[in-house]
């Protein structure tokens, strides 16, 4: 399960997700990827499930990059507990995702294999996604870094 090694604060506020992603919104390492089209929280278990789905489909071919990291703790109070008496303890970690954020990247496989692997991964995620290629970003005029 992905989680930070150390954090400054054990509990954080929920916050709000407005606007589009300003960083991580282009393909930096691979040739293909999936990009979020809506905002949401993705838990570390969902990231791991998507990673396993990709790796199972591509088998030993290709390399996969996970471009998001769950750095936000989500607290929960125990079941059947009365209101009050402080905030609950951290239960799991989430990555805050905004529209435009590239979640996973893959290279070393054909486009059809990458498209199917990303489709399987997107079924494990709670946000809507779309398949993107490095060509898409080069056509838009943005320079794409070689990873």
From Swiss-Prot:
Belongs to the universal ribosomal protein uL16 family. It comes from Clostridium botulinum (strain Hall / ATCC 3502 / NCTC 13319 / Type A). SUPFAM superfamilies: Ribosomal protein L16p/L10e (SSF54686). This is Large ribosomal subunit protein uL16. It holds the Pfam family Ribosomal_L16. Binds 23S rRNA and is also seen to make contacts with the A and possibly P site tRNAs. InterPro entries: Ribosomal_uL16 (IPR047873), Ribosomal_uL16_bact-type (IPR000114), Ribosomal_uL16_CS (IPR020798), Ribosomal_uL16_dom (IPR016180), Ribosomal_uL16_sf (IPR036920). Keywords: Ribonucleoprotein, Ribosomal protein, RNA-binding, rRNA-binding, tRNA-binding. Part of the 50S ribosomal subunit. One of its GO terms (cellular component) is cytosolic large ribosomal subunit. GO terms for biological process: translation. Gene3D superfamilies: Ribosomal protein L10e/L16 (3.90.1170.10). One of its GO terms (molecular function) is rRNA binding.
């Amino acid at each position: 399960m992905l989680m930070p090694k150390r954090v400054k604060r054990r509990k954080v506020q929920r916050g709000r997700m407005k606007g589009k992603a300003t960083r991580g919104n282009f393909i930096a390492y691979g040739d293909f990827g999936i990009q979020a089209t809506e905002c949401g929280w993705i838990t570390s278990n969902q990231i791991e499930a998507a990673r396993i789905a990709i790796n199972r489909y591509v088998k030993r071919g290709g390399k996969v990059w996970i471009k998001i990291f769950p750095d936000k703790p989500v607290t929960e109070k125990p079941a059947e507990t009365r209101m009050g008496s402080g905030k609950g303890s951290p239960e799991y970690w989430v990555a805050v995702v905004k529209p435009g954020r590239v979640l996973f990247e893959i290279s070393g496989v054909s486009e059809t294999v990458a498209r199917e692997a990303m489709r399987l991964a997107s079924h494990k995620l709670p946000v809507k996604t779309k398949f993107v290629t490095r060509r898409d970003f080069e056509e838009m005029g943005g320079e794409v870094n070689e990873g």
